[in-house]
């Protein structure tokens, strides 16, 4: 591991250490360190260590922008939940300011859109109507687990996005994993808990379910395009705060049944080795340090939310080998995403497969602006990356 990587990880680890450990930054690695922190949206964390006139204005500017963005996203979140709570619509706030609150300096965690989960179908339909009545605009986006709404604040002209989840995460090819996720986060079983952020109470997932959700959120990003250090920081800080409230045996059971236990192991051990997660949290879980180093290097080589290229093809699982049947399975899943209702009728599948393939080819050349060959090659490469985490035991089931 390069010196810049080691130094960067020590700085991240220091965020929540009291007292912080001494970190020495050799002058020759400062440019690379600033570039790395910029890619991972963590520039403000360098402020205690770098005061060079060459870099300090950039660090301060980024810190101010993140502070402003935090305030705006917090107001956006308050607006949405006030609309729902006024009409007694049950919801779960995912990530966002809920996770920021676990950081020593909440404003230094990058925020994007707002994610809310509604697992009750009648409540979801009511929420959609309310959003439309309150100036939210539904975006034309194909997703198997959420709807995207935009809202523009008249006073400042800023447009913010809301992802309204009707499933907690996207579908996998591996059906048992989908079944476990649906069971854990179903309306009949899942109970909300309250979290107070800056004096305002929000409904959030209970700690055990929140931990399981974060694992699946990271897994989906990893299978798609990878992810940056922020998601590992989220996981680390959340577990540090809520470890006593988390039922780790249930986490083990859910991960085992959905066959993502190896992913949980490498995440937990990597957070211990590189981000300061205490060894006392779920101590029975261990993983090979060499694999963890390879994993963290993959994380550091990506951007904040992964490396999205124009020829990315989203994979819903990990395969021992890529065959024509693999592409057919992925295409079949995309058919269900594109046609969630009529896709339930097997008699229509042949026609829907053809339509799905037509849109895939069209999007490859017109939207992704690449070739079919390059897209499939990138899919091969993405599958190679997923072998490290042994997801679904790399099953072709």
Give the positions of each predicted feature:
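Conserved NTP-donor binding/palm subdomain of two-metal-ion nucleotidyltransferases/polymerases, i.e.
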Residues: 1-112, 118-397
């Amino acid at each position: 591991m390069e010196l810049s990587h080691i130094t960067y990880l020590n700085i991240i680890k220091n965020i929540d250490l009291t007292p912080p450990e001494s970190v020495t930054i050799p002058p020759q690695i400062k440019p690379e360190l600033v570039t790395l922190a910029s890619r991972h949206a963590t520039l403000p964390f360098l402020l205690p260590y770098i005061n060079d006139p060459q870099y300090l204005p950039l660090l301060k500017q980024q810190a101010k922008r993140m502070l402003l963005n935090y305030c705006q996203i917090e107001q956006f979140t308050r607006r949405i939940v006030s609309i729902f709570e006024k009409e007694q619509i049950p919801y779960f706030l995912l990530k966002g300011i809920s996770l920021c609150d676990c950081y020593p300096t909440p404003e230094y965690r990058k925020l994007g859109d707002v994610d809310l989960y509604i697992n009750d179908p009648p409540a979801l339909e009511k929420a959609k109507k309310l959003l439309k009545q309150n100036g939210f605009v539904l975006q034309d986006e194909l997703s198997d687990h959420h709807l995207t709404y935009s809202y523009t604040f008249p006073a400042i002209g800023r447009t913010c996005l809301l992802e309204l989840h009707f499933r907690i995460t996207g579908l996998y090819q591996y059906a048992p994993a989908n079944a476990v996720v649906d069971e854990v986060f179903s309306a009949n079983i899942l109970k909300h808990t309250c979290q107070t952020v800056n004096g305002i109470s929000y409904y959030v997932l209970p700690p055990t379910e929140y931990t399981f959700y974060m694992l699946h959120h990271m897994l989906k990003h990893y299978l798609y395009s990878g992810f940056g250090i922020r998601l590992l920081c989220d996981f680390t800080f959340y577990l540090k705060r809520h470890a006593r409230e988390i039922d780790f045996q249930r986490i083990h059971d859910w991960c085992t049944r959905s066959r993502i236990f190896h992913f949980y192991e490498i995440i937990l051990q990597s957070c211990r080795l590189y981000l300061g997660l205490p060894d006392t949290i779920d101590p029975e879980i261990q993983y090979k340090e060499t694999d963890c180093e390879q994993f963290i290097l993959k994380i550091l080589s990506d951007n904040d939310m992964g490396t999205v290229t124009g020829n990315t093809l989203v994979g819903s699982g990990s395969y021992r080998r890529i065959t024509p049947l693999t592409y057919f399975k992925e295409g079949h899943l995309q058919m269900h995403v594109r046609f969630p209702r009529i896709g339930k009728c097997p008699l229509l599948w042949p026609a829907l497969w053809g339509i799905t393939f037509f849109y895939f080819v069209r999007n490859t050349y017109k939207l992704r602006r690449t070739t079919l060959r390059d897209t499939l090659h990138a899919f091969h490469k993405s599958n190679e990356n997923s072998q490290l985490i042994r997801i679904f035991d790399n099953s072709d089931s």
